[in-house]
Swiss-Prot record:
It is found in: Cytoplasm. Keywords: Cytoplasm, Lipopolysaccharide biosynthesis, Transferase. Disulfide bonds: none annotated. This is 2-dehydro-3-deoxyphosphooctonate aldolase. One of its GO terms (biological process) is keto-3-deoxy-D-manno-octulosonic acid biosynthetic process. GO terms for molecular function: 3-deoxy-8-phosphooctulonate synthase activity.
Length: 284
């Protein structure tokens, strides 16, 4: 199958090209912390030769608790993103939750993300498509990999085929997620070769049934990411924090920032090896 290439400026995203890192922090906590984290990602990815897109949310609209931190909001968030782009020359990805956010966000960032909980909301899909921006679609935990073709078709019908898919795990009973590595290739086939990336951070979530925030399995981030990279991915999605236990959102799943370089060295080694193999058709 011919693999679709999605371009984020000069960055090419495809299942058979070297992987792209979509990384940063879960939510913008402050301007200074965003600058610090972005600078570290840029330094490490440039050293390792990994194409890089900075990720952060300006508003976490789907927090479990009404009391949880959501972010600085649209106006302040866009100012921070603009400064990061000017300071470090990075591409930026962030998520939108409402139709009214689509155009102003697309005027600043390079990729707009459709959250998993909203991935079947047709009006939001159409509004995102009309911006002409590159789209990253999070696979809902409750949707099978094969059904992702329907979501991509909505974007195409609305005039935008620059769509990347992102697996972040599937429901496994109550309050737990599991990643079906076979589903990655199912998504590729269901969408006619669209790029698929893997969000290892959110796949590590594991909830306390009565808690007000998500727990996580940070200690297993490397082994789960290695498994994903071994399948062959267009990209990897990872969030890091200098003090994960103090992070304002999803700290239990965040990679410690000082572990980013050795972590990415492993991911790049696996990606280079897997993509050096000739295609092997075992269907016949």
């Amino acid at each position: 199958m011919k693999q679709k290439v999605v371009s984020i400026g000069d960055i090419k995203v495809a299942n058979d090209l070297p992987f792209v890192l979509f990384g940063g922090m879960n939510v913008l906590e402050s301007r200074d912390l965003a600058m610090r984290i972005c600078e570290h990602y840029v330094t490490v990815t440039q050293k390792l030769g990994i194409p890089y897109v900075f990720k952060a949310s300006f508003d976490k609209a789907n927090r479990s608790s009404i009391h949880s931190y959501r972010g600085p909001g649209l106006e302040e968030g866009m100012k921070i993103f603009q400064e990061l782009k000017q300071q470090f020359g990075v591409k930026v990805i962030t998520d939108v939750h409402e139709i009214s956010q689509c155009q102003p966000v697309a005027e600043v960032v390079d990729v707009i993300q459709l959250p998993a909980f909203l991935a079947r909301q047709t009006d939001l899909v159409e509004a995102m498509a009309r911006t002409g921006a590159v789209i990253n679609v999070k696979k809902p935990q409750f949707v099978s990999p094969g059904q992702m073709g329907n979501i991509v078709e909505k974007f195409k019908e609305a005039g935008n085929d620059q769509v990347i898919l992102c697996d972040r795990g599937s429901n496994f009973g109550y309050d737990n997620l599991v990643v079906d590595m076979l589903g990655i290739n199912v998504m590729v086939k269901a969408t006619g070769g669209h790029p698929v990336i893997f969000d290892v951070t959110h796949a590590l979530q594991c909830r306390d049934p009565f808690g007000s925030a998500s727990g996580g399995r940070r200690a297993q981030v490397a082994e789960l990411a290695r498994a994903g990279m071994a399948v062959g991915l267009a990209g990897l999605f990872i969030e890091a924090h200098p003090e994960p236990n103090s992070a304002k959102c999803d700290g239990p799943s965040a990679l410690p920032l000082d572990k980013l370089e050795p972590f990415l060295m492993q991911m790049k080694a696996i990606d280079d090896l897997v993509k050096s193999f000739p295609e092997l058709d075992t269907s016949k």
